[in-house]
Amino acid sequence: YMAPMVHWPEVMVTHESSEKILFSADGFGKFGALDYEDPEGWACEARRYYFNIVGKYGAPVQALLKKAAGLDIRTICPLHGPVLNENLGYYIGLYDTWSSYKPEDKGVLVAYASIHGNTAKAAQKFAEMLRAKGVEKVSVMDLSRDDMAEVVEDAFRYDRMVLAAASYDGGVFPCMQDFLHHLQSKAFQNRTVGIIENGTWGPTAGRTMKGILETMKNITIVEPMVTICSTMKESDLPAMEALADVIANA
């Protein structure tokens, strides 16, 4: 069976009917090996693998899943990672969610790009506000230091995202721009996003982030957009609380 763009143009998969094995190429692959017990389970590294390698090609993956639905499959053998031979519906269900760009979990990614540490403090404070409002899953990622592949993974995992970034050279601090371009290239869509910008004389981070987000499909950018001048002050907290209310209830 031909499976173009999962994730190479010439990809094909093979179904061995006597043993009911699907040799799935890059489909159902993950980082890791059979003899390694991943404490976070199969999904964590499989999700990171999918969105950073196959993620742009959701439609071809959906087409492959439709072909696979008509086959009797007992074992899946991907090119990368362990052989799958139990609870196949779980793996197939996750691939269906991922390739249709639906959120896997309810939760919030707070991704920040901080130059001197002030935007980082605001992002951490905002995460505390979300937890206080009952949001159980809040992932806080530092775009200057954390693995970009893991930040992209969490962006696709959760249904909401908040971006906090410093203004830089009339735009946004480059690691935030890099992150947004990663999402753009992976067809990020169907999410709710809030924005926190930091600047001194003329903040530009917010409109820059918003402009990139507006090129993506079905992204809801919520208000208010929070503007911090250099460092978070007591007077900034009401706007942050208002945004946290909107995100927590989205």
What are the roles of these predicted feature ranges?
Residues 15, 22, 107-111, 194:
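Conserved beta-strand elements of the Class I
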Residues 147:
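Active-site loop segments of alpha/beta catalytic cores
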Residues 27-29, 80-83, 115:
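Glycine-rich beta-alpha junction loops
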Residues 26, 112-115, 143, 197-198:
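Cofactor-binding loop segments of dinucleotide-utilizing enzymes, especially the Rossmann-like FAD-
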